[in-house]
Amino acid sequence: IMMAMKLEKENALEKAINLENQLKEKAKDFEKKEEEMNDWLSKVKNIQTEVDTVQESLQEAISKLEETEKRATNAEAEVAAMTRRIRLLEEDFEQSSGRLTETSTKLDDASKAAEESERNRKTLETRSISDDERMAQLEEQVKEAKYIAEDAERKYDEAARRLAVTEVDLERAESRLETSESKIVELEEELRIVGNNMKSLEVSEQESLQREESYEETIRDLTERLKTAEQRAAEAERQVSKLQNEVDRLEDELLSEKERYRAISGELDTTFAELTSF
């Protein structure tokens, strides 16, 4: 019996030693796991910080893109306004041309009447008051023609003023388009930096991977919107160039019509002087 008890005691002691060794191993494993957990939590915290930084960069890029789109829209609106002004200017120009043609016709009629009056003047000197009325009528026609010509000149001056205003508006639109292009270049650089930062992130958890995919999708969307804004800005610039050509053409036509008016005005003054000498 003593031998059995001694053997049992030795077995119990051996088990106690084994359990103590196992407990120490478990404690070491626990410490190792705890250390790994702390490292993992530190990595997650760093990743979260990088994600927050990317979010701020994305928000700033979105704000700048919205500002660029707004400026492009404003530029397009200015181009549309200038188009309407050019159209109104063309209408005024056409009306002035029509009045000038009418003035030329009346001047021709007055000149013909003056020539006829000159041919008949010597034979009509002894006639009654009807001859004086005829002369007064001719003078009234000449005065009316001169008034119409002066009105046409005022219309030309107004057209020239509107052309000057349109040129100023075109210069402002071009300046704003240049500013928009500069902002677009800056935004492209910022988007490129954001894209590089996104690629350098090391996301070990599924949630971080999902966030990265979401940010990449947002960047693609921003890039697409940026391309659209660039296209709109380019289109607005083409419209400005087209309008500038139209303004140049109208200025040339206006100059030609003014020269024509000066010639007609000279003829009108000569005719009026001849009629006055009667």
Curated annotation (Swiss-Prot):
Biased composition (Polar residues): 95-104
Superkingdom to which the source organism belongs: Eukaryota
Region of interest (Disordered), residue spans: 92-134
Alphabetical UniProt keywords: Coiled coil, Repeat
Bias kind Basic and acidic residues: ranges: 105-134
Stretches assigned to coiled coil: 1-270
Cited InterPro entries: Tropomyosin (IPR000533)
Subunit (UniProt): Homodimer.
Free-text function comment from the UniProt entry: Tropomyosin, in association with the troponin complex, plays a central role in the calcium dependent regulation of muscle contraction.
Domain notes: The molecule is in a coiled coil structure that is formed by 2 polypeptide chains. The sequence exhibits a prominent seven-residues periodicity.
Family the entry assigns: Belongs to the tropomyosin family.
Protein name (Swiss-Prot/TrEMBL): Tropomyosin A
Species this protein is from: Echinococcus granulosus (Hydatid tapeworm)
Record lineage: Eukaryota, Metazoa, Spiralia, Lophotrochozoa, Platyhelminthes
